């Protein structure tokens, strides 16, 4: 009996389809229909009979939910199991869906902080810093870097998952993902901390004293001068930490934005901010 094999072309097709995984998002099965759509090239390759194709499609219409950028290993391992099943291996529906469930949780645990908590804020911050100066490269930089990394994660995850098959489950159970997540979180916090002083500008021009200088000119000491001597960027850091604390207490971000607008306008009108 000729062995049925998923080709590299099938993997490319599944990779391209995976970018539409959320197009059919719903609150019953989340990405379930999208995952089924991703599997169609493999199913057509492995099951020539229409009845077998229908059964395989139904098998993948169940609930599925993980970070889209890291869904590659799940698609690949599932395809590898379908390939083994099509070639006579004793693999039932429960085993295939069990592997999907076993992978999507750990991958979401690392994918969310990596993609949404680290990659997107860092690339958006870099793009915004250019956009604030009127540079059109700002949004383009964000778009291309974010998507290049996102697509690379998905593609190499797909290749790795298909190459290793179900053995990848043991890797997901180790400390590798936890260490990767912690490292990415530290990097993201470091970059955002550096950008705090660049983005947040607070100036308190209240005059504390005026003294004659050596050249006869008047030397004015303001509250901002004193704060800068103690710790440059102290107010920016304090405001950022306050906002983080309020967000952690579930304060509505929109209200915080309006509050900052109001504080800035009132402070400038009364002369204690500029």
Swiss-Prot record:
Membrane topology: Multi-pass membrane protein
Transmembrane parts of this sequence: 61-81, 99-119, 126-146, 186-206, 226-246, 253-273
Predominant location category: membrane
Domain PTS EIID: residue ranges: 4-273
Keyword line: Cell inner membrane, Cell membrane, Membrane, Phosphotransferase system, Sugar transport, Transmembrane, Transmembrane helix, Transport
Description of what induces expression: By L-sorbose.
UniProt protein name: PTS system sorbose-specific EIID component
Organism: Klebsiella pneumoniae
């Amino acid at each position: 009996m000729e062995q049925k094999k998923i080709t590299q072309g099938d993997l490319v097709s599944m990779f391209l389809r995976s970018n539409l995984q959320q197009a059919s998002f719903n609150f019953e099965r989340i990405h379930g229909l999208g995952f089924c759509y991703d599997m169609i090239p493999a199913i057509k390759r492995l099951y020539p009979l229409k009845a077998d194709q229908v059964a395989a499609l139904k098998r993948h219409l169940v609930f599925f939910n993980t970070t889209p950028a890291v869904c590659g290993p799940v698609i690949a391992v599932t395809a590898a199991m379908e390939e083994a099943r099509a070639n006579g291996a004793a693999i039932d529906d429960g085993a295939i869906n069990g592997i999907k469930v076993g992978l999507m949780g750990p991958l979401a645990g690392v994918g969310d902080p990596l993609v949404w908590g680290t990659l997107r804020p860092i690339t958006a911050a870099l793009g915004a810093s250019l956009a604030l100066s009127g540079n059109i490269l700002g949004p383009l930089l964000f778009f291309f870097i974010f998507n290049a990394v996102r697509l690379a994660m998905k593609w190499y995850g797909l290749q790795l998952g298909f190459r290793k098959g179900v053995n990848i489950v043991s890797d997901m159970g180790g400390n590798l993902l936890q260490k990767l997540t912690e490292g990415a979180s530290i990097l993201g916090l470091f970059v955002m901390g550096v950008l705090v002083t660049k983005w947040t500008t607070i100036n308190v021009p209240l005059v504390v004293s005026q003294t004659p200088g050596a050249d006869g000119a008047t030397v004015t000491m303001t509250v901002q001068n004193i704060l800068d001597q103690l710790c440059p960027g102290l107010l920016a850091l304090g405001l950022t930490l306050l906002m983080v604390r309020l967000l952690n207490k579930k304060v509505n971000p929109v209200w915080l934005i309006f509050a900052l607008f109001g504080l800035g306008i009132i402070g400038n009108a009364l002369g204690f901010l500029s």
